[in-house]
Amino acid sequence: MEEETHTDAKIRAENGTGSSPRGPGCSLRHFACEQNLLSRPDGSASFLQGDTSVLAGVYGPAEVKVSKEIFNKATLEVILRPKIGLPGVAEKSRERLIRNTCEAVVLGTLHPRTSITVVLQVVSDAGSLLACCLNAACMALVDAGVPMRALFCGVACALDSDGTLVLDPTSKQEKEARAVLTFALDSVERKLLMSSTKGLYSDTELQQCLAAAQAASQHVFRFYRESLQRRYSKS
C-alpha cells in the first residue's frame, strides 16, 4: 500500500555515532560509504548503516542474452546474496523490490538491448537491511555512471507496541516492533518509489511513517552528496 501524505510524526531519538550528516533532530544510525573498491564490476560501493553492511557491484550497460533482450530499454536485474547460504524467499522478495526501485529511476531507454545487473552481498545484518541494500545499490549505480533521473534511498521505520516511531531500527527493535515499514524515496521530490510493510498499523501510522521517512531522506541524500564531494575532490 502506498501513501504520499505528509504528516508530522513523533520520533524517538536513537543516538548515532560515526561519520554522517545528521543533525540533532535525526535518529538515523551512523553512515559510511566507499565507492570503486572492486575491480571487476563497472561500479561498486560498500554501504554501512550502524552495524548493517552491504557490498554492491554494478555490471553494465553490457550485452544481454537474446531471450532477455528488451528492444526499447535496458534489462535490469538484481541479485541479492545472503551472508551465509543460498538465496531464499526473503532474498527473492527483496530483489524484486530493489529492481522495481531501480527501474523507476534508471534511464534504461538510453541503452536499449543491453543489461544492467546489480549484485548485492550482505556483509552483516543488524537491522534495516532492505534500506541498506537500496542505499548500496544507488551508490554503486552512481559509481558505474548509469544514467538516472534521480538518486534514491531507503529508510526503514518501526512502530513499537505503544505506537512510538523508531527510524532505522536495529534487529532487536525490529523483532520487538508491532510493524516495520521500509520506503524507497527519490531525491528530487521525495516521491515514494516503493514500500514494503510487515505487521499491523493504521492508515494514520502509515502516513506518519512515510512523513518521517521523507524527512529522514534529506539526511541520507546529504550524506550521498558529501560522500561524493569528498571522493571527487581527491581525484
From Swiss-Prot:
Annotated segments matching region Disordered: 1-24
Any one GO BP annotation for this protein: defense response to virus
UniProt entry keywords in alphabetical sequence: Cytoplasm, Disease variant, DNA-binding, Exosome, Intellectual disability, Nucleus, Phosphoprotein, rRNA processing
UniProt GO cellular component terms: cytoplasm; cytoplasmic exosome (RNase complex); cytosol; euchromatin; exosome (RNase complex); nuclear exosome (RNase complex); nucleolar exosome (RNase complex); nucleolus
UniProt xrefs under InterPro entries: ExoRNase_PH_dom1 (IPR001247), ExoRNase_PH_dom2 (IPR015847), ExoRNase_PH_dom2_sf (IPR036345), PNPase/RNase_PH_dom_sf (IPR027408), Ribosomal_Su5_D2-typ_SF (IPR020568), RNase_PH (IPR050080)
Tissue-wise expression: Highly expressed in a variety of hematopoietic and epithelial tumor cell lines, but not in normal hematopoietic tissues or other normal tissue, with the exception of testis.
Entry-linked CDD domains: RNase_PH_RRP46
Effect in UniProt of substituting L206H: In CABAC; strongly decreased interaction with EXOSC3, EXOSC9 and EXOSC10, when assayed in a heterologous system
One annotated GO molecular function: RNA binding
Modified residues (Phosphoserine): S20
Compositionally biased tracts (Basic and acidic residues): 1-13
UniProt main location, coarse: nucleus
Subcellular location: Nucleus, Nucleolus; Cytoplasm; Nucleus
Gene3D superfamilies, A to Z: GHMP Kinase, N-terminal domain
Subunit structure: Homodimer. Component of the RNA exosome core complex (Exo-9), composed of EXOSC1, EXOSC2, EXOSC3, EXOSC4, EXOSC5, EXOSC6, EXOSC7, EXOSC8 and EXOSC9; within the complex interacts with EXOSC3, EXOSC8, and EXOSC9. The catalytically inactive RNA exosome core complex (Exo-9) associates with the catalytic subunit EXOSC10/RRP6. Exo-9 may associate with DIS3 to form the nucleolar exosome complex, or DIS3L to form the cytoplasmic exosome complex.
Function (record text): Non-catalytic component of the RNA exosome complex which has 3'->5' exoribonuclease activity and participates in a multitude of cellular RNA processing and degradation events. In the nucleus, the RNA exosome complex is involved in proper maturation of stable RNA species such as rRNA, snRNA and snoRNA, in the elimination of RNA processing by-products and non-coding 'pervasive' transcripts, such as antisense RNA species and promoter-upstream transcripts (PROMPTs), and of mRNAs with processing defects, thereby limiting or excluding their export to the cytoplasm.
Family: Belongs to the RNase PH family.
Clinical note on disease: Cerebellar ataxia, brain abnormalities, and cardiac conduction defects: An autosomal recessive disorder characterized by global developmental delay, impaired intellectual development and speech delay that are observed in most patients. Disease manifestations are variable and include infantile-onset hypotonia, poor motor development, poor feeding and overall growth, and ataxic gait due to cerebellar ataxia. Additional variable features are dysarthria, nystagmus, variable ocular anomalies, spasticity, hyperreflexia, and non-specific dysmorphic features.
Name assigned to this protein: Exosome complex component RRP46
Species of the source: Homo sapiens (Human)
Gene: EXOSC5
